[in-house]
Structures are given as structure tokens and as C-alpha cells.
Amino acid sequence: MERGVRVFGEPKVELHIHLDGAIRPETILHFGKKRGVPLPGSTVDELMKHVSYQTPLSLKLFLEKFNHYMPAIAGDREAVRRIAYELVETKAKEGVVYVEVRYSPHLLANCRVEPIPWGQAEGDLTPEEVVNLVNQGLQDGERNFRIKARSILCCMRHMPSWSPEVVELCKKYQNNSVVAIDLAGDELLMASSDHKAAYEEAERCGIHRTVHAGEAGPATMIKEAVYLLKAERIGHGYHVLEDPELYRELLRTRMHFEVCPWSSYLTGACLPDFRKHPVVQFKKDQANYSINTDDPLIFNSNIDKDYGIVKEYMDFTEEDFKRVNINAAQSSFLPEKEKQELLNTLYEAYGMVPATS
């Protein structure tokens, strides 16, 4: 399947996309050359043969793809700011009017981070400066492309020692582009006491919370996310259907699922038959969910690809797409006033309320 053609031409909201999984291949090549970092190819086509894929792999093999290109980006100030800026430009071209992009500040740093990621030598780019650079890139992109962009800082399941700093950065930049905390990585690793403490502090300080859960892992991981970590949204969450009682409860409370159809196919999170995808059940039950790209670089995709899949295989209509995006806006981590402005933008574009101008 190729990148999608536009199937829904109205404004869209995207809540689940990883900054380090959404870098332009041209940008990777530029910084690889500039910094003398070897890459598995010297052209976009060659690079993409190693970085992206189109038939299902395990989540573990998918995660190994990052090793091919992250050394060209991590630890470089210009690169970090630029990938954030370019993401906003890409989303604007896709018709997204609001995006929440997530990343681990530690995985883009090379100083005051233990261990230093991607085999880098120690440098002078700290996790906090990474947050500042991403904020700059997002804010410059907002100004130039006239969409709204906010960020979510990720704790990593395999690195609980980073989590205390992640929540402190969320607190410090809470009113400056950062809207939430996330927990990502291998779901086989249960949330450690450090992750739990970080989420407790986030809740205490009014920081929004989402958790990757029930993607490759079982429904018990969603229980952990909701009841232990007090998640307000679930990243993926497909395996919630294995626990009907939990599913009914989350339907009742309008828990939001950040669904990524093409990703769920390529990581083997779901059965390869899209007609049996959990989203079919979510749609039938009018659950609260959004449609997102996750890692469009590695999946060689864009938002139209995911919209195309649910239209072709799950019979999504224009009205379904409108409902999904209104759900996304309502479940966004924007402050209430900005959330209402976003909803009004969608209502007006969708012809659901008369224009007030």
C-alpha cells in the first residue's frame, strides 16, 4: 500500500505521533552528511529501504529501525529544532489543524543522560535543552503554518530512572507547548515505582496523562494505565476487547483510545485482516477514539493512509470522520478555552453550527 490520497478534506486533529518516528528522510541524510554519521543509504530510496517497511514485523524489530537513523539527529541542536518545525509543516499540508506530538527528551540528548543513547559520545545537549529546542521548532511552525501544535513528554518503560526528570520538565514547561506526560516502550515491563511516582506527581500538578497500553500487551496493561497511573487517554488500547468488563467500563467513562490503524498492522499489534480490527468494534459501539499515524517515517505513511484504510475496510463515512475528529478535539489536552476554540473551528468547517463571522 502506498501513502494515502486525501479521503477527508476537512480539518483534522492528530493526538498520537512520535517526533522521532516522523522525521523527513531528507533531513536525516542532511544531518548524517553534515555530522559525518554513517547511514545505511545515501539517497532517500536507499535509506527508506532500511528504515521503513510495508509487511508486519514484531514490535521489537520495529523499534530496531530507530537505530539506523537516530544517531544522525540526536545530540544536534539544529536537527532537534528542525524536526519539530518540519513536523508542523507536514501536518499543516495534511490538513491537520491541531497536533499533539510526543517524544522522549532523553533520547534526543547526549549530556546529563545515563546511558547516553544511540552510542553517541558525550556532548552538551541536555534533556531540558531538547525540550526548549522542540518548543522553538513547534512555535515557529505554528506561526508560519497557522496550525496549533503541542507536545507530550515520554517516560520510557525500560528507563525508569529518567521518569522523575520527565515529570519535572512537564511541570516546568506546562504552559509552554508541553501539555502531558506519556509512558512508552516495551509493555512487557510493568510500570516501575519510578513511573508510578512520576504519574502521581503529574496528577497532583494537574498535568494530563496518557499511556501506551494494550498495543502489543494484554488488557491488564490497560487496567494498569487507568487504575494505577490514572491515564486520561490510552495509546492504542486494542487489546481492551479481551476484557469485556473493562471495555464496558471504559465505554461508560468515555475513555479515549488513540488508534493507529496502519501502525497496528505493521507492528503485529492486531490481526492483519482490517475487517476484524478493534476499530470496527469501537465504531459500532460509538467509543471515544481518534485516528493517528504513530510513526509515519517508519511506516512510510501519512494521515491520509490511515483514513484511507478505515474508509476502505471499515466503511467509514464523512460523518464518521467528523465524529472521530470532534472526539479527538474533546479529548485533547488543551486548556478548556483553547479546546473550545478548536471545537468551534471544527464545527464551523463541518457545517455543524452556523458560521459566527
From Swiss-Prot:
One Pfam family it belongs to: A_deaminase
Task: Tell whether Hydrolase is among the UniProt keywords.
Answer: yes
What is one Gene Ontology biological process annotated in the Swiss-Prot or TrEMBL record? inosine biosynthetic process
> How does this protein sit in the membrane?
Peripheral membrane protein
Q: How is the cofactor bound?
A: Binds 1 zinc ion per subunit.
Q: Which residues bind Zn(2+)?
A: 16, 18, 212, 294
Keywords (alphabetical) are: Cell junction, Cell membrane, Cytoplasm, Cytoplasmic vesicle, Hydrolase, Lysosome, Membrane, Metal-binding, Nucleotide metabolism, Zinc
Q: Where this protein primarily resides, as one coarse class?
A: membrane
Q: Name one GO molecular function term.
A: zinc ion binding
Positions bearing the site annotation: Important for catalytic activity: 236
**Per the entry, which co-factors are needed?**
Zn(2+)
Signal peptide residues are none
User: Which PROSITE patterns does the annotation name?
Assistant: A_DEAMINASE
Decide whether keyword Metal-binding is in the record. Answer: yes
Q: Which domain of life is it from?
A: Eukaryota
The first-level EC class reads: hydrolase
Which GO CC terms are listed, alphabetically? anchoring junction; cytoplasmic vesicle lumen; cytosol; external side of plasma membrane; lysosome
Q: Give the active-site positions.
A: 215
Checking CDD domains in the record gives:
ADA (cd01320)
Q: Which reaction(s) does its UniProt entry say it catalyses?
A: adenosine + H2O + H(+) = inosine + NH4(+); 2'-deoxyadenosine + H2O + H(+) = 2'-deoxyinosine + NH4(+)
Q: Where in the cell is it found?
A: Cell membrane; Cell junction; Cytoplasmic vesicle lumen; Cytoplasm
Q: Which HAMAP family match?
A: A_deaminase (MF_00540)
Give a short account of what the protein does. Answer: Catalyzes the hydrolytic deamination of adenosine and 2-deoxyadenosine. Plays an important role in purine metabolism and in adenosine homeostasis. Modulates signaling by extracellular adenosine, and so contributes indirectly to cellular signaling events. May act as a positive regulator of T-cell coactivation.
Q: Which NCBIfam families match?
A: aden_deam
Family from the record: Belongs to the metallo-dependent hydrolases superfamily. Adenosine and AMP deaminases family.
The protein's name in its UniProt record: Adenosine deaminase
Name the encoding gene, please. Answer: ADA
